Each structure stands twice: as C-alpha cells, then as structure tokens.
C-alpha cells in the first residue's frame, strides 16, 4: 500500500493506492480544507486514524449482548510521496501560502513509513502528467508534434502560480521543478504597465504569481475598479461575502458586467504571455500544459483566442510558437496521481 498527497494553500488531498506497475484508482481518498488545521501532521493523523463511530447503547430489555467492536489492524504503508505547494529542499518543504514546514524524514519516523518523499507540487503534477489519459486534457492549440521527444512545459495557476519543465533523458521524461512563478512580472501593453504600477504601490516585488492566481485575478479586478470606476454595486456586495476570484470568473464568463469581462481578458492575456515565455525558455516543442484549478474553470475564456494570441506574440518566433501543442489538464487530481506514481516506484 502506498500513500500519496497533494498539499495546497486551499485544499489538501490524501489517498491510499495499491499501485504496483500501472496507474490504478485510489482505494480511499479524502480532501481537507488546509486552513482548518494547524499542521499537515494533524491532517495526516486524522486520515490514517479517522474518528471511530460512537458505540451504540444497548436498548433496555434486550437480552442479546452486542458484539464488541474489533480494533482496526494497523495500516502498513510501504512508501509515501507528498506534493507540496512551495520549494522542497533536502526533503523539507515550506508551504508558500500556509505557515507549514513539512519534513519527509520526520514524517517517516512519526508515522512509521519506510520512505516519505516530498516534491514540489508542480513536480508532482509533472509526474502525473505522464500518467494522464488523452480525455483528461483539452486542446487549446493542436500544434505540430516534433519527430523526437523534446521538453514539455507545465504552468499552473491556482492559489499560487507553479511552473515546471519535463526533459527527455534518452530513456524517460524527468520533471524539473522551479519557482518561476515568483520571477518578475513583465507587462506587455500600456494597460499592463498601469497594472504593474498599481501593484507596486502594495508590493515591493511584483511577481507573476501576483497576477496569475486566484488572488491575482482579484488584484486585476481591483486595479480595473480603481482606475475605470465601473464596479456594479451588486458585484461589490457579492465579492465581500463570497470567494472574490470565483465571483469575478462567473460574472466575466456570463458577461454580466463589463469589469468582469475586462478582468478575464487581461488575466487570459497575461497567462498566455507567461506560458509562452516558459515555452521559449525551455524550448518545450513537445507541448505546454496548463494545470492548476483555474484553467479548467476558465476553459471557455482560454479557448476564445486571447490566450493563444498572447502565447504566440513573440515577434520573430511567432511561427515557432504557433507550432507548439498547448493543452489544459482537466483532471484536478493530476498532482495526487503523480505523487502516487513516485511512491509506487519508491515501494519497489
């Protein structure tokens, strides 16, 4: 039995697999709200030792004695792999959007697991990408597949922004994690320059993650609100009591307010530009994949051409960029599947 996990700033997903050689479905899987817990250890402890149902009181007058509850047999886990939303160095991971420090060796000792491997969450997603079925991705640009295996790029906007590259070593694809989402945001239009100026009033360093994430979509909306002065009162009221990014996405997709439409236009264009940057830096001729929770929810918007226009807008390299396949990962369990694939190898 192997344990796989995906630790994000919003949700933590854990699962047990009986994975030997090929991908299988999880035997048990649970999703937890990360901010409801003080540490990852608390979540893992609850997952491995779920609360037992209260004993049923015997009904007065019944002669038959109820059978005694049998204690659960201890679960034997051969290996574990956990994807962490943050940098992982020497099997220790600091979550970017949570005050958690995970230590793989300490987890192995506490929970009596022979091996616990921590990966950056995008590295885990990259491993998962290699296990996905065609139906678990959707095409944004068909492109032209190269005759030889070339690098693959992965970019994922969600609570934060993650980036990774997969390179072919002659035998198999090997994921290479990065923290590219924290590099400097580079505007490509007068409007984006104004956005950067607006954000610099709040942040000393404006990274791509400040605009390409759930909070980033909200930041784009606030910029438009403060400069265009076109926020409907009803929308402002909803944003105050609901998830801002979800409200903005819904309003923009349904075209219920101009500011929502404009926010999604700007977000999709910036997303395409940075995905194109990553493709060029890695020469990802075998494809660029969009992971994370935002792309599937904005799929209709990403398919309207604004994303690919920004993606291919690289001057003399426009023709090359147009040849790169681009797909959206629509399976939200890709990181978990990738962690399971790694754990299965560790268990052998």
Task: Locate each region found by the language model.
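Short, acidic Gly/Pro/Ser/Thr-rich loop/turn segments
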Residues: 12, 87-89, 160-164, 219, ...
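Short, electropositive alpha-helical surface patch
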Residues: 133-143, 344-347
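Short beta-strand-loop/turn "lid" adjacent to the catalytic site in phosphate-handling enzymes
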Residues: 51-54, 71-118, 123-136, 154, ...
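Glycine-rich beta-strand-to-loop/alpha-helix junction loops that act as flexible
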Residues: 82-86, 157-159, 285-294
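ATP-binding/phosphotransfer module of carbohydrate and carboxylate kinases, centering on a glycine-rich
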Residues: 1-54, 69-76, 194-348
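Glycine-rich phosphate-binding loop of actin/hexokinase-like ATP-binding domains
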Residues: 139-142, 147-209, 299-302, 306-312, ...
């Amino acid at each position: 039995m192997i344990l796989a996990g995906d630790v994000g700033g919003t949700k933590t997903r854990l699962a047990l697999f009986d994975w030997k050689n090929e991908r299988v479905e999880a035997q048990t899987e649970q999703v937890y709200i990360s901010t409801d817990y003080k540490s990852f250890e608390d979540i893992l402890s609850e997952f491995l030792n779920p609360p037992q149902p209260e004993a049923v009181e015997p009904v007065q007058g019944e002669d038959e004695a109820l059978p005694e509850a049998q204690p659960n047999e201890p679960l034997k886990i051969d290996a574990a792999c956990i994807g962490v939303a943050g940098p992982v160095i020497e099997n220790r991971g600091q979550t970017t959007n949570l005050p958690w420090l995970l230590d793989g060796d300490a987890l192995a000792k506490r929970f009596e697991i022979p091996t616990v491997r921590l990966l950056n969450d995008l590295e885990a997603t990259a491993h998962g990408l290699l296990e996905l079925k065609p139906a678990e991705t959707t095409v944004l640009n068909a492109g032209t597949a190269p005759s030889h295996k070339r690098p693959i790029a992965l970019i994922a906007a969600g609570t934060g922004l993650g980036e990774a590259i997969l390179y072919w070593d002659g035998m198999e694809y090997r994921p290479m994690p990065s923290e590219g989402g924290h590099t400097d945001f580079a505007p490509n239009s007068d409007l984006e320059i104004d956005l950067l100026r607006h954000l610099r009033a709040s942040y000393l360093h404006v990274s791509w993650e400040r605009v390409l994430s759930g909070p980033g979509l909200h930041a784009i909306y606030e910029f438009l609100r403060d400069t265009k002065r076109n926020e409907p009162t009803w929308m402002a009221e909803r944003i105050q009591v609901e998830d801002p990014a979800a409200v903005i996405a819904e309003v923009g997709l349904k075209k219920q307010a101009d500011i929502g439409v404009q926010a999604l236009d700007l977000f999709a264009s910036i997303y395409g530009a940075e995905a194109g940057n990553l493709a060029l830096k890695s020469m990802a001729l075998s494809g660029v994949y969009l992971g994370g929770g935002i792309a599937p929810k904005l799929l209709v918007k990403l398919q309207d051409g604004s994303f690919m226009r920004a993606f291919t807008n690289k001057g003399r390299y426009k023709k090359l960029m147009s040849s790169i396949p681009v797909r959206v990962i629509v399976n939200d369990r890709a990181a978990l599947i990738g962690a399971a694939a790694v754990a299965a190898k560790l268990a052998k």
